[in-house]
Each structure stands twice: as structure tokens, then as C-alpha cells.
């Protein structure tokens, strides 16, 4: 008499890992541009990480705000300069808004791009921020290629602009150029590297500890464990169906649960074996350490991003750290971003903005 072969099947809930640093395992090769990361999607990965780690994102936001400041002090007796400060381009952006976006891109991706628009008579000057994630360095290293979706690049949809100080005539008759700001990093020629690059790992740790807390809330702090199910399964497909039914029966996503389907006997011995783990303290300490390391990687200061010390907040400490940040980070970044703008004002519209 033929006997059906019974088979035990093991399945684990919540076992899929989310990518953190790469969006694709493939390596991109092109004779049109220099790739930014192996898959040419490094800006997307950096942006994704900034949306996942709260401390990491807060520091980037604060850096951009501190660098842009509340506005500019300038000679209001120069009407052309006043006009550019108040409205730097046809989109209605003020110069402060443009600089703030440049500072944000540079803090986040280590690169920033400023488009410059004028005409042959130099009768006007417009400055546009270009999203760094849309920009790639052309193979000749003299142009920047802009595309809306680098995961599906099409040459006919791209816009190419020359790197400053070269200008090229466009279809609308304007002369355009683009300035590439980048953070220096040895061994990297075409793109800059963000200063916090050594803190990518701890940013991921902070993100994962947040995920752990969220999963604990989603499961109402239910224990993880092993669910032993007595059921007869003729094949793997049948066993998988039984497991899926069990998952739906137990709230669909019951924490970290391992389901084991075994051949049933005369009596039903299905049971749940909890696995108790008292590691809240370890996770809390890990999160605190990751937060401290993120601040260090950014070359930033805790009190300037709303992070307290064990001794609590101190007005004197905040003022001291701001003074250090002003002289080591903020003023240097302001000068780096504004130096080309001052040069453009002098060369194109004859405005001296050195003061």
C-alpha cells in the first residue's frame, strides 16, 4: 500500500531585510557619464538614509539652516544687487533659498549644483539650484548631465550644461553654465563625498533601533517564539498554505515567530513556545551610542541639534558650541558657497558684492 510522505516545514516571519546603502546589486557602465556609486544611484541611497535616521536628518537640516542664516546684509544703495538678493531667478526664489538648498545638498550628498543663466549682453543674471541627485558628470569632465530618473536614463531626455566658467547657448537663446560644489575626498575625482561618510553604519544602527521600537509597538509587545502546528501536509505547497492560514489566525504579523508544521497525531499538540528576551537596556544603549557617533561623524555639536547632555541643557554650553561651529564650519561653508556667486555678480552684471 502506498503511503504519503509527510514533511515538516519551517518558515520564519519578518525575515526579509531592507536595503540601506544600495538600491541595486548591478554595476552601471556608460560612455556618457561618470557613474556616482557602483549602481550610479548613490544620491538616492544617501537620500533614503536621511529619511530613515532622525538624528542624521536633523543635523543635515540644522547645518543647512545655520549656513544659510536668516538672510544677507548688503548695500541697499545698489538696486541690482538688492533685486538679485530678493529674487535670484524667474521661479521667484530668493538668494537665501537658493543658498539654503545648496547647503542642504552639500551636507547630504557632498555635492551641490548651481545653474547660472544670462545672455550675450549680460543684461541679467539668474541663479537656479539644481537637485544634486539629478546631476552626473559627463565623460569629458567638462559638462554636467541632468536627468529626471537615472534608473531609466535616456539620452534624448537629458539636459547638458557646461561647467563654469564656460557658457553655452541654449535653444531659448540664453547662455547657461553650472557650478559644481563638492567635498574633497582622496581617491574621488568626479564627485565629492559627504563628511559623515564614516557614520553611515551608525546611521543605519539608529534607524534599525527605531524599527525595533516600532515593531514592538506594532505587535503590542507580544513575545516572539516558536509556533508548533500539528497538521498533515502531503507536500510543501500544502504546508505553506497551512502556515499562511496560521499567520492570518495570529494577527498576520505576530512579532518574530517561527512556524513549524509537523505531522499530526491522534491528539492536537499545537502550542506556542515563547522566547523571552530582556534586552531593552542593550538596545537603548546602542541607540544612544549611535546618536553620539552620528554627531561626531558630522563634525557637529549636540546642543545645536536639540540633543541634550547627561548634565542637561546649558545656555553657556550652547553659546560656546555655536561659537566653535561658527568659526570651524558655518563661516567656511558660507564663503565656499558665496565666492562663485560674488564672482558672477562682478563679471556678469558689474556688481561688487565683496562687502
Regions from the PLM with identified roles:
Residues 2-264:
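Structured, contiguous alpha/beta core segments that scaffold functional sites
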Residues 84, 88, 102, 230, ...:
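Generic structural signal for hydrophobic core residues of well-folded globular domains
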Residues 225-230, 270-277, 317-324:
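Short, hydrophobic beta-strand segments
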Residues 322-340:
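Long, continuous compositionally biased terminal/linker segments
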Residues 232, 236, 280, 284, ...:
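Hydrophobic alpha-helical scaffolding
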Residues 201-203, 312-319:
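A short small-residue
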Residues 142-169, 238-316, 335-354:
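Long amphipathic alpha-helical segments
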Amino acid at each position: 500500500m502506498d503511503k504519503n510522505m509527510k514533511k515538516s516545514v519551517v518558515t520564519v516571519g519578518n525575515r526579509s531585510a531592507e536595503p540601506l546603502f544600495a538600491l541595486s546589486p548591478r554595476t552601471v557602465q556608460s560612455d556618457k557619464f561618470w557613474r556616482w556609486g557602483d549602481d550610479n544611484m548613490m544620491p538616492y541611497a544617501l537620500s533614503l538614509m536621511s529619511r530613515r535616521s532622525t538624528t542624521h536628518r536633523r543635523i543635515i537640516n540644522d547645518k543647512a539652516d545655520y549656513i544659510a542664516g536668516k538672510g544677507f546684509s548688503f548695500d541697499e544703495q545698489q538696486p541690482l544687487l538688492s533685486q538679485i538678493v530678493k529674487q535670484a531667478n524667474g521661479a521667484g526664489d530668493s538668494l537665501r533659498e537658493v543658498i539654503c538648498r545648496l547647503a542642504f545638498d552639500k551636507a547630504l550628498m557632498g555635492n551641490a549644483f548651481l545653474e547660472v543663466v544670462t545672455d550675450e549682453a549680460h543684461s541679467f543674471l539668474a541663479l537656479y539650484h539644481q537637485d544634486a541627485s539629478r546631476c552626473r558628470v559627463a565623460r569629458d569632465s567638462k559638462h554636467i548631465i541632468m536627468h529626471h530618473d537615472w534608473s531609466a536614463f535616456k539620452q534624448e531626455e537629458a539636459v547638458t550644461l557646461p561647467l563654469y566658467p564656460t557658457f553655452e547657448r541654449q535653444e531659448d537663446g540664453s547662455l547657461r553654465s553650472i557650478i559644481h560644489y563638492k567635498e574633497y575626498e582622496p581617491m574621488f575625482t568626479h564627485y565629492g563625498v559627504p563628511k559623515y561618510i564614516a557614520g553611515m553604519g551608525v546611521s543605519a544602527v539608529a534607524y534599525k533601533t527605531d524599527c525595533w521600537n516600532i515593531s514592538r509597538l506594532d505587535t503590542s509587545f507580544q513575545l516572539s517564539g516558536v509556533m508548533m502546528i500539528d497538521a498533515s501536509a502531503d507536500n510543501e505547497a500544502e504546508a505553506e498554505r497551512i502556515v499562511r492560514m496560521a499567520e492570518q489566525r495570529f494577527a498576520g504579523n505576530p512579532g518574530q515567530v517561527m512556524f513549524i508544521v509537523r505531522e499530526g497525531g491522534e491528539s492536537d499538540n499545537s502550542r506556542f513556545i515563547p522566547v523571552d528576551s530582556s534586552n531593552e537596556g542593550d538596545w537603548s544603549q546602542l541607540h544612544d551610542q549611535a546618536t553620539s557617533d552620528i554627531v561626531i561623524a558630522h563634525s557637529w555639536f549636540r546642543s545645536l541639534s536639540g540633543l541634550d547632555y547627561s548634565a542637561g541643557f546649558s545656555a553657556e554650553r550652547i553659546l560656546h558650541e555655536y561659537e566653535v561651529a561658527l568659526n570651524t564650519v558655518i563661516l567656511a561653508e558660507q564663503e565656499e558657497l558665496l565666492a562663485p556667486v560674488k564672482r558672477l555678480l562682478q563679471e556678469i552684471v558689474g556688481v561688487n558684492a565683496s562687502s
